[in-house]
Amino acid sequence: MKKEMTITYKVESGLYLNITNKCSNRCSFCIRNNGDGAYGSDSLWLSREPTAEEIWNAVVAANPDKYSEVVFCGYGEPSCRLDVMCEIAKRIKENYKVPVRVNTNGQSSLINGRDTAPDFSVFDCVSISLNAPTAERYQEICKSQYGERAFDAMLDFAREVKKYSPEVLLSVVKETMSEEELSACIRLCDEIGVKIKIRNYIG
């Protein structure tokens, strides 16, 4: 029987949460352009937005303590459901010992119309997709609904959120940029004072 919704799925030793299909970007390299699932999961396309209680029930059923971490990352931008995301993260922290991370495009404050960095204090790690060293290049490959201003908003978010979360990373996909662009991204991370995560393209 086909599942109505895949809310939880496993990636290596992590439990991943797929809470929305909404996203403010249309990245050219996004894994969802190439199929319905990721890492052998069932389809991550949701028939509807799951309620907070449905997400929580899926989390409990999966037993987070069996995993090395819980990660908010699916076929959408988790901060499009900021309140639900933070509620579930808080409940996980209250009931389990596992660290909680969110993978985000860093546009939460644009999406929600306010400074949302303090909301992310519930996360042990905030991993932000940098993807490019300039606003022009970022818009070229990420195609944000907010245009080129999304890039500066993302960097501002990174600067702010490091005040609230103990670990902040900016990630890049190695295959989508030149060596010069990668070097520029590394310098940008140094200027902001956060670590860079260089990951490989998953197609």
Set out the residue ranges of the language-model regions.
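A generic local structural motif
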Residues: K2-E4, W56-V59, N112-T116
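Canonical Radical SAM [4Fe-4S] cluster-binding loop centered on the CxxxCxxC motif
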Residues: K2-P50
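Flexible, charged surface loops at secondary-structure boundaries
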Residues: Y9-V11, A62-D65, F120-S121
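Short, basic/glycine-rich phosphate-binding loops at helix/coil junctions
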Residues: N34-G40, K66-V70, T134-R137
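Short Fe-S-cluster ligation motifs
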Residues: P50-Y75
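Conserved AdoMet/S-adenosylmethionine-binding subsite of the radical SAM
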Residues: Y75-G203
